[in-house]
């Protein structure tokens, strides 16, 4: 809803609701001995069956009042509610793969509910020199209520609780932020923006653990934009960023990929980073597309990774980490080759570094890819109701770091696409498909008897994980 209430007042409202019931995500894991590089003898086979119920709603809006040509006021609000109920059952087979002699080895349930409320008020002032000043305040409240349970079963069906502590709780955050920014021209071709934000927040946890902490951060930012040609622009920025804490990390859970309990860490704090970003944007003639080259560097204080907590691996903060990245992405119209066609592409190379808290050796960041590529081809067939899309994405391998484990994970390339039929001006029928390639990924895992710094190897395994492909039919309407 977008309504001009008075000549000086505009009101915008929106509402969204969703539900996604019993979304099955079957997955198979095959394990081999460390010396079985050809993957001929299966030691273990685990089949995961999952259900995932989701529902929620969001209500948002803003009111804008114009005092005169130079001054205006805007108030925004967002209210969100999300519910998620996940259940997983693992069926295991030990050395009898051909006979399919499976037994249920574990049952896991994860019930969570999220609430969010954001209120933001800002004033804007325009100046004769082309500058603009914005200042205001923002208030946010976030809440997570979560309950996790893990039950182990042996081949005889005898169950045993995992006995894990801190599996139920409520995490709440109250956050307040004041901000001011000034955007102004330096020359006819160069604009700059300087900004300063101050953030204060309190995070409290109740349930199995009772804890409350406060955080305060200054977040400066400076931007430059240079239109050195009509269709080319250079952008440069320096800023301090504060990471967003994942509230799930405060409460214990189970990592299905690593088959390890992940303890909750009530002492977790947000990471902070100084970031430098340099971009060059080239807009092709005749609205032919855009190509962007980006260089990025960041120094992170307290990156969030796995640390030892109470005999388990938990999510916690490390020392100082670094990230550097070069990225190329763009979108080009290819009507001369494919009428109505658009080709999108993306690729990046990056390097990361942090000091491992257990081995005291520098390494890359946990689960960070060194490179990624993407190709996306779409065609709106001229003079017809049809459009189609095919996309391809590939990744480098990633390393898995844990106080008690080291692993390597490499995903197979992913292929997907869609076909859309325009029924009328308001309705579309979409056919979507994904994961057409057979395997999902391959990996290697080394589990240590104690900290990995002792080099006392307990288990070495090779494995691959297979996710099933899917086909989805969707009716989409606009009213």
PLM regions: where:
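Outer-membrane beta-barrel signature, preferentially recognizing the C-terminal barrel domain
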Residues: 167-171, 213, 242-292, 297-299, ...
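Periplasmic-side early beta-strands and strand-to-turn transitions of outer-membrane beta-barrels
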Residues: 1-48
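Face-selective signature of the C-terminal outer-membrane beta-barrel domain
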Residues: 4-20, 50-207, 211, 217, ...
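Membrane-embedded beta-strands of outer-membrane beta-barrel proteins
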Residues: 59-61, 119-121, 178-180, 220-222, ...
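Outer-membrane beta-barrel translocator domains and adjoining extracellular loop/strand segments
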Residues: 24-42, 86-95, 100, 146-154, ...
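Gram-negative outer-membrane beta-barrel transporters
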Residues: 294-299, 317-398
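C-terminal beta-signal and adjacent terminal beta-strands/loops
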Residues: 242, 345, 396, 421-479
């Amino acid at each position: 809803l977008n309504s001009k209430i008075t000549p000086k007042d505009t009101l915008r409202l929106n509402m969204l609701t969703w539900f996604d019931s019993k979304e099955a995500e079957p997955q198979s894991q095959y394990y081999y001995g460390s010396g079985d590089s050809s993957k001929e003898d299966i030691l273990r086979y685990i089949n995961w069956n999952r259900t995932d119920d989701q529902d929620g709603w969001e209500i948002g809006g803003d009111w804008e009042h114009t005092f005169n040509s130079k001054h205006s006021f805007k108030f925004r609000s967002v209210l969100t509610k999300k519910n998620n109920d996940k259940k997983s059952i693992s069926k295991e087979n030990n050395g009898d793969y051909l006979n399919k002699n499976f037994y249920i080895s574990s049952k896991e349930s994860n019930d969570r509910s999220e609430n969010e409320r954001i209120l933001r008020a800002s004033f804007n002032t325009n100046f004769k020199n082309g500058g603009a000043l914005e200042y205001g305040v923002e208030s946010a409240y976030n809440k997570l209520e979560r309950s996790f349970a893990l039950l182990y079963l042996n081949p005889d069906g005898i169950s045993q609780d995992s006995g894990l502590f801190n599996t139920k709780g409520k995490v709440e955050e109250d956050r307040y932020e004041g901000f001011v920014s000034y955007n102004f021209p330096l020359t006819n071709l160069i604009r700059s923006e300087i900004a300063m934000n101050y953030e204060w927040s309190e995070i409290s946890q109740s349930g199995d653990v009772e804890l409350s902490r406060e955080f305060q951060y200054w977040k400066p930012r400076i931007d430059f934009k240079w239109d050195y040609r009509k269709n080319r622009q250079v952008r440069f920025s320096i800023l301090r960023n504060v990471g967003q804490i994942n509230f799930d990390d405060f409460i214990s859970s189970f990592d299905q990929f690593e088959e390890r309990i992940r303890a909750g860490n009530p002492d977790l704090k947000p990471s902070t980073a100084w970031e430098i970003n340099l971009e060059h944007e080239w807009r092709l003639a005749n609205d032919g597309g855009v190509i962007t080259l980006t260089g990025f560097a960041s120094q992170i204080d307290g990156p969030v990774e796995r640390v030892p907590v109470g005999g388990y691996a938990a999510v916690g903060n490390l020392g100082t980490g670094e990230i550097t990245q070069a990225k190329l992405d763009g979108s080009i119209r290819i009507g001369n080759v494919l009428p109505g066609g658009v080709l999108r592409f993306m690729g990046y190379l990056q390097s990361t570094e942090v000091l491992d808290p257990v081995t005291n050796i520098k390494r890359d960041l946990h689960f960070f890819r060194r490179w990624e590529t993407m190709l996306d081809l779409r065609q709106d067939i001229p003079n017809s109701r049809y459009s189609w899309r095919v996309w391809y994405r590939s990744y480098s391998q990633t390393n898995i770091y844990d106080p008690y484990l080291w692993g390597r994970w490499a995903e197979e390339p992913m292929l997907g696409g869609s076909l859309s039929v325009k029924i009328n001006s308001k309705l579309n029928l979409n056919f979507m498909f994904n994961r057409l390639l057979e395997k999902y990924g391959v990996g290697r895992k080394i589990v240590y008897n104690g900290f990995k710094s002792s080099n006392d190897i307990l288990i070495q395994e090779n494995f691959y994980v297979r996710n099933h492909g899917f086909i989805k039919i969707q009716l989409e309407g606009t009213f």
